[in-house]
């Protein structure tokens, strides 16, 4: 197992169904000789040169710090250090991906939750010792870490099914969904393009905005509409009225209706 072999496995998994993609990536969590060799090499380089920077991307999000060994639209392979929370989390993140987690310095301790209908329910405790590989289907499962047990180091792989990835943030006390997001890089690129067209005043590109209004998630449709209104308010009024009347999401209908009421001219009192 080498980093080059990992890169080849990620490439091979790119167009595979979820089970096939997992079959390509799972061996690199079962045998982490490649990771240990990389750590040994980089430690030697830093001893020889205190200014040496490892040739991988580093990132931080919340309590997690990450070294990124592979990242594509579908597959991430990362080494992570998580600072434990002072108290148990009140919300759960269902990432929409399949997670493979190998603890490196201590056991993973926590509580497993699953989705039944639209609610999160407790499934029981989790104990994954060092050297084991914990697998979670984070489309329907989420782990709440036990607070206060010291930093946790893990090697992780996150593998998405083909197509857009839907993540959910669910309140533990009520079990209800608090937020939905679609990790859809195609839509993100589309929205960036629409923003550029708007900044350039490209009113001749209105058909691009019309086409993007059929995005699958409510927040995506509303984001497109805001760009459309900023580009050409007059041209956007008809699709805005359609959205206020017929959008599948009640909140989007309400936002569109409120916006339409502010934009439509007042009738002449004469």
Where do the language-model regions lie?
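A short, N-terminal "cap"/entry segment at the start of jelly-roll beta-barrel domains
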Residues: 1-76
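Conserved short histidine dyad/triad with adjacent acidic residue
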Residues: 77-95, 127-129, 137-139
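Short, conserved beta-strand element in jelly-roll/cupin
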Residues: 94-110, 114
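A short hydrophobic beta-strand segment most commonly corresponding to one strand
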Residues: 99-101, 148-167
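Short acidic-glycine-tyrosine-enriched beta hairpin
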Residues: 99-102, 115-146
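Amphipathic alpha-helical scaffolding segments comprising HEAT/armadillo-like alpha-solenoid repeats
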Residues: 172-178, 202-213, 233-245, 267-270
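Alpha-helix N-cap/helix-start positions at coil->helix boundaries
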Residues: 186-187, 217-222, 234, 249-251
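Structural detector for internal amphipathic alpha-helices that build alpha-solenoid repeat scaffolds
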Residues: 191-200, 222-231, 254-264
